[in-house]
Amino acid sequence: MSTVSSTNTTQQAAAPPKGRTTAQNIGLILAFIVLGVILLLPTPETLSTGGHRMIGVLAFAIILWMTSAVSYPVSATMITALTALLLGFSPNPEAPAKMLGTANALMLIISGFSSPAMILVGAAMFISVAMRKTGLDRRIAMLVLSSVGTKVSRIYLGVIITGLILAFFVPSATARIACLAPIIIGIVENLGIERKSRVAALLMVGAVQADTFWNIMIQTAAAQNLVAVGFMQTQMNTSVSWIDWLTAAAPFSIIMVIIAYFLTQALIKPEFKELVGGDVQLAKMRKEIGPMSTDEKKLLCISIGLLALWATGGKLHSIDTTTTTIIAIALFFFPKIGIMDWKFAQPNIDWGSIVMFGAGIGLGTVLLKTK
Protein backbone atom coordinates (compact mmCIF):
# COMPACT_ATOMS: atom_id res chain seq x y z
CA MET A 1 0.00 0.00 0.00
CA SER A 2 1.38 3.42 -0.95
CA THR A 3 1.05 6.42 1.33
CA VAL A 4 1.12 10.15 0.76
CA SER A 5 3.76 11.99 2.70
CA SER A 6 3.61 15.61 3.78
CA THR A 7 7.42 15.86 3.83
CA ASN A 8 7.57 17.78 0.55
CA THR A 9 4.92 20.19 1.78
CA THR A 10 6.89 20.81 4.97
CA GLN A 11 10.12 21.35 3.04
CA GLN A 12 8.39 23.79 0.71
CA ALA A 13 6.97 25.71 3.67
CA ALA A 14 10.42 25.89 5.30
CA ALA A 15 12.23 26.92 2.11
CA PRO A 16 12.82 30.63 1.55
CA PRO A 17 10.45 32.23 -0.94
CA LYS A 18 11.75 32.54 -4.49
CA GLY A 19 12.25 36.04 -5.86
CA ARG A 20 9.70 37.49 -8.24
CA THR A 21 10.60 37.76 -11.91
CA THR A 22 10.43 40.94 -13.96
CA ALA A 23 7.65 39.42 -16.07
CA GLN A 24 5.55 38.80 -12.95
CA ASN A 25 6.01 42.37 -11.77
CA ILE A 26 5.08 43.72 -15.20
CA GLY A 27 2.01 41.47 -15.26
CA LEU A 28 0.84 42.73 -11.86
CA ILE A 29 1.35 46.38 -12.82
CA LEU A 30 -0.37 45.82 -16.18
CA ALA A 31 -3.36 44.21 -14.45
CA PHE A 32 -3.89 47.27 -12.26
CA ILE A 33 -3.39 49.66 -15.20
CA VAL A 34 -6.00 47.85 -17.31
CA LEU A 35 -8.38 47.78 -14.34
CA GLY A 36 -7.93 51.52 -13.85
CA VAL A 37 -8.42 52.31 -17.54
CA ILE A 38 -11.66 50.31 -17.69
CA LEU A 39 -12.99 51.99 -14.55
CA LEU A 40 -12.25 55.44 -16.03
CA LEU A 41 -14.16 54.69 -19.22
CA PRO A 42 -17.75 55.99 -19.36
CA THR A 43 -20.36 53.38 -18.43
CA PRO A 44 -22.52 52.34 -21.42
CA GLU A 45 -26.22 53.08 -21.05
CA THR A 46 -27.08 49.39 -21.36
CA LEU A 47 -24.68 48.41 -18.55
CA SER A 48 -25.00 48.99 -14.82
CA THR A 49 -22.22 50.61 -12.81
CA GLY A 50 -21.63 47.32 -11.01
CA GLY A 51 -21.46 45.44 -14.31
CA HIS A 52 -18.98 47.99 -15.68
CA ARG A 53 -16.72 47.59 -12.66
CA MET A 54 -16.93 43.80 -12.76
CA ILE A 55 -15.71 43.82 -16.37
CA GLY A 56 -12.66 45.61 -15.02
CA VAL A 57 -12.20 42.97 -12.32
CA LEU A 58 -12.54 40.22 -14.94
CA ALA A 59 -9.86 41.83 -17.12
CA PHE A 60 -7.67 42.22 -14.03
CA ALA A 61 -8.07 38.52 -13.22
CA ILE A 62 -7.36 37.36 -16.77
CA ILE A 63 -4.10 39.33 -16.91
CA LEU A 64 -3.01 37.93 -13.54
CA TRP A 65 -3.66 34.39 -14.76
CA MET A 66 -2.07 34.88 -18.19
CA THR A 67 1.12 36.40 -16.79
CA SER A 68 1.31 34.26 -13.62
CA ALA A 69 1.85 37.55 -11.80
CA VAL A 70 0.77 35.88 -8.55
CA SER A 71 -0.23 32.36 -7.60
CA TYR A 72 -3.81 31.28 -8.27
CA PRO A 73 -4.86 31.28 -4.59
CA VAL A 74 -3.43 34.79 -4.15
CA SER A 75 -5.25 35.97 -7.28
CA ALA A 76 -8.45 34.58 -5.75
CA THR A 77 -8.04 36.74 -2.64
CA MET A 78 -7.32 39.80 -4.81
CA ILE A 79 -10.42 39.18 -6.93
CA THR A 80 -12.55 38.77 -3.80
CA ALA A 81 -11.22 41.96 -2.21
CA LEU A 82 -11.61 44.06 -5.37
CA THR A 83 -15.14 42.79 -5.95
CA ALA A 84 -16.20 43.55 -2.38
CA LEU A 85 -14.88 47.12 -2.65
CA LEU A 86 -15.76 48.08 -6.23
CA LEU A 87 -19.16 46.41 -6.26
CA GLY A 88 -19.90 47.41 -2.68
CA PHE A 89 -19.62 51.10 -3.58
CA SER A 90 -21.82 50.68 -6.66
CA PRO A 91 -25.53 51.56 -6.76
CA ASN A 92 -27.86 48.81 -5.54
CA PRO A 93 -29.77 47.51 -8.61
CA GLU A 94 -32.94 47.20 -6.51
CA ALA A 95 -32.56 50.67 -4.94
CA PRO A 96 -30.30 52.82 -7.16
CA ALA A 97 -30.29 55.69 -4.66
CA LYS A 98 -28.34 53.52 -2.20
CA MET A 99 -25.01 51.75 -2.39
CA LEU A 100 -25.02 47.95 -2.55
CA GLY A 101 -22.65 47.77 0.43
CA THR A 102 -19.44 45.81 0.85
CA ALA A 103 -21.14 43.14 2.98
CA ASN A 104 -23.67 42.38 0.24
CA ALA A 105 -20.97 42.48 -2.44
CA LEU A 106 -18.83 40.10 -0.41
CA MET A 107 -21.73 37.69 -0.04
CA LEU A 108 -22.10 37.64 -3.82
CA ILE A 109 -18.45 36.91 -4.56
CA ILE A 110 -18.13 34.21 -1.89
CA SER A 111 -21.34 32.53 -3.05
CA GLY A 112 -19.12 30.39 -5.24
CA PHE A 113 -17.91 28.56 -2.13
CA SER A 114 -21.42 27.22 -1.48
CA SER A 115 -22.17 26.15 -5.05
CA PRO A 116 -22.61 22.44 -5.87
CA ALA A 117 -19.72 22.67 -8.33
CA MET A 118 -17.42 24.00 -5.62
CA ILE A 119 -18.40 21.20 -3.23
CA LEU A 120 -17.71 18.66 -5.98
CA VAL A 121 -14.21 20.08 -6.50
CA GLY A 122 -13.48 19.89 -2.78
CA ALA A 123 -14.80 16.33 -2.63
CA ALA A 124 -12.62 15.39 -5.59
CA MET A 125 -9.53 16.45 -3.64
CA PHE A 126 -10.50 14.06 -0.83
CA ILE A 127 -11.12 11.23 -3.29
CA SER A 128 -7.72 11.91 -4.86
CA VAL A 129 -5.99 11.74 -1.48
CA ALA A 130 -7.86 8.51 -0.68
CA MET A 131 -6.74 7.03 -4.01
CA ARG A 132 -3.11 7.91 -3.38
CA LYS A 133 -3.20 6.77 0.25
CA THR A 134 -4.57 3.34 -0.55
CA GLY A 135 -2.66 2.97 -3.82
CA LEU A 136 -5.84 2.14 -5.74
CA ASP A 137 -4.95 4.63 -8.48
CA ARG A 138 -1.55 2.96 -8.97
CA ARG A 139 -3.14 -0.49 -9.02
CA ILE A 140 -5.57 0.59 -11.74
CA ALA A 141 -2.70 2.08 -13.75
CA MET A 142 -0.55 -1.04 -13.43
CA LEU A 143 -3.43 -3.33 -14.42
CA VAL A 144 -3.95 -1.28 -17.57
CA LEU A 145 -0.29 -0.68 -18.47
CA SER A 146 0.78 -4.28 -17.95
CA SER A 147 -1.86 -5.31 -20.48
CA VAL A 148 -1.13 -2.94 -23.36
CA GLY A 149 2.42 -3.93 -24.29
CA THR A 150 5.79 -2.17 -24.33
CA LYS A 151 5.51 0.03 -27.40
CA VAL A 152 5.58 3.72 -26.49
CA SER A 153 2.31 4.26 -28.37
CA ARG A 154 0.69 1.46 -26.35
CA ILE A 155 1.99 2.77 -23.03
CA TYR A 156 0.67 6.19 -24.01
CA LEU A 157 -2.70 4.61 -24.79
CA GLY A 158 -2.61 2.89 -21.39
CA VAL A 159 -2.08 6.24 -19.64
CA ILE A 160 -5.08 7.69 -21.51
CA ILE A 161 -7.26 4.70 -20.58
CA THR A 162 -6.19 5.04 -16.94
CA GLY A 163 -7.26 8.68 -17.07
CA LEU A 164 -10.64 7.61 -18.46
CA ILE A 165 -11.19 5.11 -15.63
CA LEU A 166 -10.28 7.71 -13.01
CA ALA A 167 -12.59 10.24 -14.68
CA PHE A 168 -15.58 8.10 -13.69
CA PHE A 169 -14.61 8.17 -10.01
CA VAL A 170 -12.66 11.40 -9.35
CA PRO A 171 -14.81 14.47 -10.15
CA SER A 172 -12.06 16.97 -10.96
CA ALA A 173 -9.33 17.12 -13.61
CA THR A 174 -6.99 18.78 -11.11
CA ALA A 175 -7.47 15.96 -8.61
CA ARG A 176 -7.09 13.28 -11.30
CA ILE A 177 -3.82 14.73 -12.55
CA ALA A 178 -2.67 14.78 -8.91
CA CYS A 179 -3.20 11.01 -9.03
CA LEU A 180 -1.78 10.44 -12.52
CA ALA A 181 1.34 12.63 -12.39
CA PRO A 182 3.18 10.63 -9.68
CA ILE A 183 2.22 7.39 -11.44
CA ILE A 184 3.59 8.60 -14.78
CA ILE A 185 6.79 9.83 -13.12
CA GLY A 186 7.15 6.45 -11.39
CA ILE A 187 6.68 4.61 -14.69
CA VAL A 188 9.23 6.85 -16.41
CA GLU A 189 11.82 6.25 -13.69
CA ASN A 190 11.22 2.51 -13.35
CA LEU A 191 11.43 1.96 -17.10
CA GLY A 192 14.68 3.89 -17.32
CA ILE A 193 13.25 6.77 -19.36
CA GLU A 194 14.91 10.17 -19.01
CA ARG A 195 12.62 12.70 -17.33
CA LYS A 196 13.53 15.33 -19.93
CA SER A 197 12.97 12.99 -22.87
CA ARG A 198 10.22 13.43 -25.44
CA VAL A 199 8.71 10.11 -24.34
CA ALA A 200 8.24 11.42 -20.79
CA ALA A 201 6.85 14.69 -22.17
CA LEU A 202 4.44 12.79 -24.41
CA LEU A 203 3.06 10.72 -21.53
CA MET A 204 2.58 13.73 -19.25
CA VAL A 205 1.26 16.21 -21.82
CA GLY A 206 -0.91 13.58 -23.47
CA ALA A 207 -2.46 12.54 -20.16
CA VAL A 208 -3.45 16.13 -19.40
CA GLN A 209 -4.84 16.76 -22.89
CA ALA A 210 -6.88 13.55 -22.92
CA ASP A 211 -8.19 14.32 -19.44
CA THR A 212 -9.58 17.59 -20.77
CA PHE A 213 -11.78 15.69 -23.20
CA TRP A 214 -12.85 13.12 -20.58
CA ASN A 215 -14.07 16.18 -18.63
CA ILE A 216 -16.54 16.86 -21.41
CA MET A 217 -17.79 13.28 -21.66
CA ILE A 218 -18.67 12.63 -18.02
CA GLN A 219 -21.01 14.99 -16.19
CA THR A 220 -19.34 14.49 -12.82
CA ALA A 221 -15.79 14.67 -14.21
CA ALA A 222 -15.56 18.45 -13.88
CA ALA A 223 -17.13 21.24 -11.83
CA GLN A 224 -17.96 23.33 -14.89
CA ASN A 225 -20.31 20.60 -16.07
CA LEU A 226 -22.43 21.00 -12.95
CA VAL A 227 -22.40 24.76 -13.44
CA ALA A 228 -23.74 24.18 -16.97
CA VAL A 229 -26.38 21.76 -15.67
CA GLY A 230 -27.48 24.30 -13.06
CA PHE A 231 -27.66 27.03 -15.70
CA MET A 232 -29.84 24.85 -17.93
CA GLN A 233 -32.15 24.09 -15.02
CA THR A 234 -32.61 27.74 -14.01
CA GLN A 235 -32.54 29.44 -17.41
CA MET A 236 -34.04 26.77 -19.70
CA ASN A 237 -36.06 24.71 -17.22
CA THR A 238 -34.32 21.61 -18.59
CA SER A 239 -32.86 18.79 -16.51
CA VAL A 240 -29.98 16.71 -17.90
CA SER A 241 -29.30 13.38 -16.19
CA TRP A 242 -25.88 11.75 -15.87
CA ILE A 243 -26.74 9.13 -18.51
CA ASP A 244 -28.21 11.72 -20.90
CA TRP A 245 -25.04 13.79 -20.63
CA LEU A 246 -22.81 10.76 -21.27
CA THR A 247 -24.85 9.70 -24.29
CA ALA A 248 -24.68 13.16 -25.85
CA ALA A 249 -21.05 13.98 -25.06
CA ALA A 250 -19.30 10.60 -25.49
CA PRO A 251 -19.03 10.62 -29.31
CA PHE A 252 -17.41 14.08 -29.40
CA SER A 253 -15.01 13.30 -26.53
CA ILE A 254 -13.90 9.96 -27.97
CA ILE A 255 -13.27 11.49 -31.41
CA MET A 256 -11.26 14.34 -29.87
CA VAL A 257 -9.18 11.94 -27.76
CA ILE A 258 -8.38 9.87 -30.86
CA ILE A 259 -7.30 13.02 -32.71
CA ALA A 260 -5.23 14.16 -29.71
CA TYR A 261 -3.65 10.68 -29.44
CA PHE A 262 -2.21 10.84 -32.96
CA LEU A 263 -1.57 14.59 -33.03
CA THR A 264 0.49 14.66 -29.82
CA GLN A 265 2.64 11.79 -31.10
CA ALA A 266 3.25 13.73 -34.31
CA LEU A 267 4.16 16.91 -32.44
CA ILE A 268 6.16 15.22 -29.66
CA LYS A 269 7.91 12.44 -31.55
CA PRO A 270 9.31 9.78 -29.17
CA GLU A 271 13.04 9.02 -29.42
CA PHE A 272 12.25 5.30 -29.67
CA LYS A 273 9.20 3.19 -30.49
CA GLU A 274 9.54 0.37 -27.96
CA LEU A 275 10.98 -0.14 -24.50
CA VAL A 276 13.41 -3.04 -24.43
CA GLY A 277 12.71 -5.10 -21.32
CA GLY A 278 9.71 -2.96 -20.53
CA ASP A 279 7.43 -5.97 -20.10
CA VAL A 280 9.67 -7.34 -17.35
CA GLN A 281 9.75 -4.00 -15.53
CA LEU A 282 5.98 -3.52 -15.79
CA ALA A 283 5.37 -7.04 -14.50
CA LYS A 284 7.76 -6.33 -11.62
CA MET A 285 5.98 -3.06 -10.78
CA ARG A 286 2.62 -4.81 -10.82
CA LYS A 287 3.94 -7.57 -8.55
CA GLU A 288 5.35 -5.02 -6.10
CA ILE A 289 1.86 -3.67 -5.49
CA GLY A 290 0.90 -6.95 -3.85
CA PRO A 291 -2.61 -8.14 -3.04
CA MET A 292 -5.44 -5.64 -2.66
CA SER A 293 -5.53 -4.19 0.85
CA THR A 294 -8.64 -3.78 2.99
CA ASP A 295 -8.57 0.00 2.51
CA GLU A 296 -8.38 -0.44 -1.26
CA LYS A 297 -11.41 -2.71 -1.18
CA LYS A 298 -13.32 -0.20 0.95
CA LEU A 299 -12.43 2.65 -1.40
CA LEU A 300 -13.36 0.59 -4.45
CA CYS A 301 -16.76 -0.30 -2.96
CA ILE A 302 -17.49 3.31 -1.98
CA SER A 303 -16.37 4.57 -5.41
CA ILE A 304 -18.50 2.06 -7.30
CA GLY A 305 -21.48 2.88 -5.09
CA LEU A 306 -20.93 6.59 -5.70
CA LEU A 307 -20.70 6.07 -9.46
CA ALA A 308 -23.91 4.04 -9.39
CA LEU A 309 -25.73 6.83 -7.53
CA TRP A 310 -24.40 9.44 -9.97
CA ALA A 311 -25.42 7.38 -13.00
CA THR A 312 -28.95 6.67 -11.75
CA GLY A 313 -29.67 10.17 -10.44
CA GLY A 314 -32.96 11.47 -11.80
CA LYS A 315 -33.82 7.99 -13.07
CA LEU A 316 -34.01 5.66 -10.06
CA HIS A 317 -33.73 8.22 -7.25
CA SER A 318 -33.90 11.97 -6.63
CA ILE A 319 -30.71 12.43 -4.60
CA ASP A 320 -28.59 15.13 -6.23
CA THR A 321 -24.98 14.59 -7.28
CA THR A 322 -23.50 16.86 -4.63
CA THR A 323 -25.30 15.12 -1.76
CA THR A 324 -24.24 11.64 -2.87
CA THR A 325 -20.64 12.86 -3.13
CA ILE A 326 -20.70 14.32 0.39
CA ILE A 327 -22.09 11.02 1.70
CA ALA A 328 -19.14 9.20 0.11
CA ILE A 329 -16.63 11.60 1.68
CA ALA A 330 -18.30 11.14 5.07
CA LEU A 331 -17.82 7.38 4.70
CA PHE A 332 -14.10 7.95 4.07
CA PHE A 333 -13.79 9.34 7.61
CA PHE A 334 -16.38 7.16 9.35
CA PRO A 335 -14.88 5.17 12.27
CA LYS A 336 -14.13 1.51 11.54
CA ILE A 337 -15.37 1.54 7.94
CA GLY A 338 -13.42 4.65 6.88
CA ILE A 339 -10.05 4.67 5.13
CA MET A 340 -8.39 7.80 6.55
CA ASP A 341 -8.69 10.43 9.26
CA TRP A 342 -8.66 14.22 9.09
CA LYS A 343 -5.13 14.42 10.46
CA PHE A 344 -3.91 12.56 7.38
CA ALA A 345 -6.14 14.25 4.82
CA GLN A 346 -5.70 17.87 5.88
CA PRO A 347 -2.02 18.40 4.87
CA ASN A 348 -2.47 16.50 1.61
CA ILE A 349 -5.41 18.52 0.25
CA ASP A 350 -4.65 21.23 -2.31
CA TRP A 351 -6.54 23.97 -0.48
CA GLY A 352 -5.21 26.61 -2.87
CA SER A 353 -7.05 25.03 -5.80
CA ILE A 354 -10.25 24.92 -3.76
CA VAL A 355 -9.94 28.63 -2.94
CA MET A 356 -9.29 29.39 -6.61
CA PHE A 357 -12.31 27.41 -7.81
CA GLY A 358 -14.56 29.07 -5.24
CA ALA A 359 -13.47 32.57 -6.22
CA GLY A 360 -13.74 31.74 -9.92
CA ILE A 361 -17.29 30.44 -9.59
CA GLY A 362 -18.17 33.46 -7.44
CA LEU A 363 -16.77 35.81 -10.08
CA GLY A 364 -18.93 34.15 -12.72
CA THR A 365 -21.98 34.48 -10.48
CA VAL A 366 -21.37 38.19 -9.93
CA LEU A 367 -20.87 38.78 -13.66
CA LEU A 368 -24.24 37.14 -14.35
CA LYS A 369 -26.05 39.19 -11.69
CA THR A 370 -24.53 42.58 -12.54
CA LYS A 371 -26.11 43.42 -15.87
Which stretches of residues belong to each language-model region?
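Juxtamembrane and boundary regions of transmembrane helices in multi-pass small-molecule transporters
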Residues: S2-P42, G122, K133-L136, A173-R176, ...
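Generic alpha-helical transmembrane segments of integral inner-membrane proteins
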Residues: I29-V37, A59-I63, A81, L85, ...
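Alpha-helical membrane-protein architecture signal
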Residues: G56, L106, G158, T162, ...
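Helical membrane-embedded segments and adjacent short helical loop/helix-boundary regions
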Residues: R20-A31, T49-I55, T67-A76, T102, ...
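Flexible hinge motifs at transmembrane-helix junctions and intramembrane kinks/re-entrant loops
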Residues: P44-T49, F60-M78, F262-K269, P291-K297, ...
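Transmembrane alpha-helix interface/packing and boundary motifs in multi-pass membrane proteins
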Residues: I63-S71, T162-S172, V208-Q219, A311-G313
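Membrane-embedded alpha-helical segments and adjacent helix-loop junctions characteristic
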Residues: T43, V74, M78-E194, G352-S353, ...
